[in-house]
């Protein structure tokens, strides 16, 4: 049957103190909304996102999924009802856009519990280490009779550890009806999604509870909670990498993106940061204090320490990128080496080429970027400036200190620096002259 997820993403997130919509704040290199969309993709046939007025950025981030606008912010139930035309004929699951850590398997469990047939409504619950002001789920094991807000709870109810964190599944027809029956007789005059339980129970419906780990159910309403969610996501990503055969000598200092792809037998030293779009092949070593984003690293390469790989970098098998070396939109061929203090931008470096310390590809003329091509087995001496567009042929040698502006043929030696001049005795004369003053 066609099942649909509805992500409620219309909130302003005022406690974030940001001009950016809350669901577009990043965790592990991608917006919170993107994490939810990825989880929903594994559990539902369709996903729709509810946004608010003037939230075009959220609609663009949700594409190609459809969006609907909650014209007035009158509460979470009102937001869900705005998407009623998208519920379809199967089951529908409502999730909050600021719960980015929930996983696809947990969402699948909600649907499976609904499919068991002994409950018409299923909600997601968790047991936080500090339940605090969360609403408590009251009922026999596995079921809910009501949700009691903390302010209204008795001491006995406050002692209950099972808390409501959002996430509701029901048949589409039931969900439409129950949402329409929720009232706004409360201090704020809003329509609250948590009242679904009371409305369903008033019809005699049974309400089941699916429990999920706390680290999947963290809400993000402030910068502090965003940092806590980031820490939880990083722990999850590190654990998955370690289980897949990656070595991290100090895992707590390594920061991964949600899409970081690490092969088995990769070794990562402390204080390495992965931005989005990094793929690392087997037997690669990434040394300490390196920063990588938007790059591909082939088997057996060695990166760092203190290396920076920027978007478009492609490191060949067995290549070396050493300390204080930066690459951007550059391919380093198999076995090539750039071991010290080098910038290679918009460049193609052939296999086994050796790039000396202090080499710079001068790729920007103030108006446009230009490419540098260095052939296989070429040797670039230290402190060389390659003024693009320029090419260096296979097996060519560039003398240290050269400024290369013209093509260098294969097997050629190129020197482009002033000739050294020596004046015997002149140093002694200068000392005498300076000393008399």
Swiss-Prot record:
Entry coiled-coil feature ranges: none
One biological process term in Gene Ontology: UDP-N-acetylglucosamine biosynthetic process
Keyword Cytoplasm attributed: yes
Residues at which UDP-N-acetyl-alpha-D-glucosamine binds: 8-11, 22, 70, 75-76, 96-98, 135, 149, 164, 221, 310, 328, 343, 354
Molecular function in Gene Ontology: glucosamine-1-phosphate N-acetyltransferase activity; magnesium ion binding; UDP-N-acetylglucosamine diphosphorylase activity
Note on cofactor: Binds 1 Mg(2+) ion per subunit.
Biological pathway: Nucleotide-sugar biosynthesis; UDP-N-acetyl-alpha-D-glucosamine biosynthesis; N-acetyl-alpha-D-glucosamine 1-phosphate from alpha-D-glucosamine 6-phosphate (route II): step 2/2; Nucleotide-sugar biosynthesis; UDP-N-acetyl-alpha-D-glucosamine biosynthesis; UDP-N-acetyl-alpha-D-glucosamine from N-acetyl-alpha-D-glucosamine 1-phosphate: step 1/1; Bacterial outer membrane biogenesis; LPS lipid A biosynthesis
Predominant place of localization: cytoplasm
Keyword Cell membrane: no
Residues of the active site: 340 (proton acceptor)
Family to which the UniProt record says this protein belongs: In the N-terminal section; belongs to the N-acetylglucosamine-1-phosphate uridyltransferase family.
NCBIfam families linked: glmU (TIGR01173), PRK14353.1 (NF010933)
Entries under HAMAP family matching the protein: GlmU
Protein name in UniProt: Bifunctional protein GlmU
Gene name of the encoded protein: glmU
């Amino acid at each position: 049957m066609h099942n649909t997820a509805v992500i409620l993403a219309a909130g302003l997130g005022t406690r974030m103190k940001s001009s950016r919509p809350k669901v577009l704040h990043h965790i592990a290199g991608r917006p919170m909304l993107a994490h939810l969309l990825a989880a929903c993709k594994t559990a539902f046939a369709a996903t729709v996102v509810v946004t608010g007025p003037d939230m075009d950025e959220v609609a663009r981030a949700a594409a190609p999924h459809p969006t609907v606008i909650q014209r007035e912010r009158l509460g979470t139930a009102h937001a869900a009802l705005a998407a009623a035309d998208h519920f379809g004929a199967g089951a529908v699951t409502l999730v909050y856009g600021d719960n980015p850590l929930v996983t696809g398997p947990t969402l699948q469990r909600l649907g499976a519990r609904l499919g068991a047939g002994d409950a018409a409504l299923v909600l997601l619950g968790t047991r936080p280490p500090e339940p605090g002001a969360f609403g408590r789920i009251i009922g026999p094991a596995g079921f809910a009779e009501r949700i009691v807000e903390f302010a209204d709870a008795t001491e006995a109810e406050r002692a209950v550890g099972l808390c409501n964190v959002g996430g509701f599944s029901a048949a589409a027809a039931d969900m439409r009806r129950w949402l329409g029956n929720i009232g706004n007789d409360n201090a704020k005059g809003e329509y609250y999604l948590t009242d679904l339980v009371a409305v369903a129970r008033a019809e005699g419906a049974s309400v089941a509870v699916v429990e999920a780990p706390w680290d999947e159910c963290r809400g993000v309403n402030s910068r502090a909670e965003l940092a806590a969610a980031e820490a939880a996501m990083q722990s999850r990503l590190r654990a998955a990498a370690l289980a897949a055969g990656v070595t991290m000598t100090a895992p707590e200092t390594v920061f991964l993106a949600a899409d970081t792809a690490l092969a088995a037998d990769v070794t990562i030293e402390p204080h390495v940061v992965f931005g989005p779009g990094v793929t690392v092949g087997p037997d690669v070593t990434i040394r300490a204090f390196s920063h990588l984003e938007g790059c591909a690293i082939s088997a057996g390469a060695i990166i760092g320490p203190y290396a920076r790989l920027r978007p478009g970098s492609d490191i060949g098998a067995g290549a070396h990128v050493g300390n204080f070396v930066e690459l951007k939109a550059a391919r380093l061929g198999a076995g090539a080496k750039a071991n010290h203090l080098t910038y290679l931008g918009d460049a193609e470096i052939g296999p086994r080429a050796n790039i000396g310390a202090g080499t710079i590809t001068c790729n920007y003329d103030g108006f446009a970027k230009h490419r540098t091509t260095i052939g296989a087995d070429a040797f670039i001496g230290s402190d060389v400036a390659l003024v693009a567009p320029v090419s260096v042929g296979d097996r060519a040698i560039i003398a240290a200190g050269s400024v290369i502006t013209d093509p260098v043929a294969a097997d050629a030696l190129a020197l482009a620096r002033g000739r050294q001049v020596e004046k015997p005795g002149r140093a002694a004369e200068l000392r005498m002259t300076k000393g008399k003053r």
